[in-house]
Amino acid sequence: MFSQKIKCKVFADLHQQDDVFLIPNPWDIGSAKVLQGLGFKALATTSSGLAYTLGRADGEVTLEEKLFHCSELAANTTIPINADFENGFADDPETVAHNVLKVANTGIAGCSIEDFSRDALSLYDLDRKSVV
């Protein structure tokens, strides 16, 4: 099993290469293993895919469920995983930062934070985004 440190290095290197790389979205361990077997260099979680496998709409997955999902994918693959971490499961930058530390501890190599508020379904203002 590759360490998280190695996966993070591989993921950073992918972003520095001259060529583009595709990063498909597995929704469970099985699809992650298939995509890894097809030769993809990295994977990214899908918030909607996870929600649908749980019989819910996109945006209805809890932080705890997302953390478990990320840890399962990271533990069952040897390539970097980037987490679709929605809005960081919080509206304030401090809680987002705390939650990013939690997801980092699952073994993933990176995460993406969206710039929208779940309640208002609108974009955060620029001042708030720049703090994060």
Which stretches of residues belong to each language-model region?
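N-terminal amphipathic alpha-helix/helix-capping segment at the start of soluble metabolic enzymes
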Residues: M1-N25, I29-G37
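Short, well-ordered coil/turn segments that N-cap beta-strands
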Residues: D18-F21, F40-K41, T77-I81, I108-A109
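Glycine-rich, proline-tolerant flexible connector loops at the mouths of alpha/beta enzymes
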Residues: A42-L67, N87-P93, C111-R128
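Conserved small/polar residues in nucleotide/adenosyl-binding loops
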Residues: V131-V132
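Conserved, mostly hydrophobic/aromatic
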Residues: D28, L35, L73, D84, ...
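Catalytic cores of alpha/beta
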Residues: S31-V34, F89-K102
